[in-house]
Amino acid sequence: MEKLKKYVLSTRFLFIAVLALSVVVFLLMLFPDTGSLLGPNIFIFWILLAFSGMGLAIITYKERISGKLKFFLLSSGFSSGGFLLGVVLHNAFYALGTLTEDLAILHAFLNFLEGTFFLIAVIACPIGLLVGLVGTLILWIKDGKRA
């Protein structure tokens, strides 16, 4: 049991989980006609991706990984966790913006925050995730060839 716990809480396992869940989420968003995974059911995969990303970031710090590998693993972890956070905050600020249409300054500020978190969720996090995944894979492949 202790061996299984060490394997599940390793950077390699969590990185593979982030990679697999990223592919699943990307395919589900690219092809939305997947039956029962339409609508709110995709949140299951988004939550799993966010938790595995946060776990990857935590384990990267705990294992005291350094150098370029640390940068790429943290980029993967934070970007996969930040995606769900950006989506939720974008929708929350949109809802608050519709409630405060009469208050011009507050409405404009909430619309600014809505757009900011939309750009974070749709542009910044996927780019960071892609950079982290590809960079980690390249470093691990180079490390495997040296050994």
Enumerate the predicted regions with their spans:
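Hydrophobic alpha-helical membrane-insertion segments
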Residues: 72-91
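Transmembrane helix-loop junctions and nearby membrane-interface residues
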Residues: 26-34, 57, 61, 87-95, ...
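N-terminal signal-anchor transmembrane alpha-helix
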Residues: 1-55
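Canonical alpha-helical transmembrane segments
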Residues: 45-75
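Interfacial non-cytosolic loop connecting adjacent transmembrane helices
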Residues: 33-44, 85-122
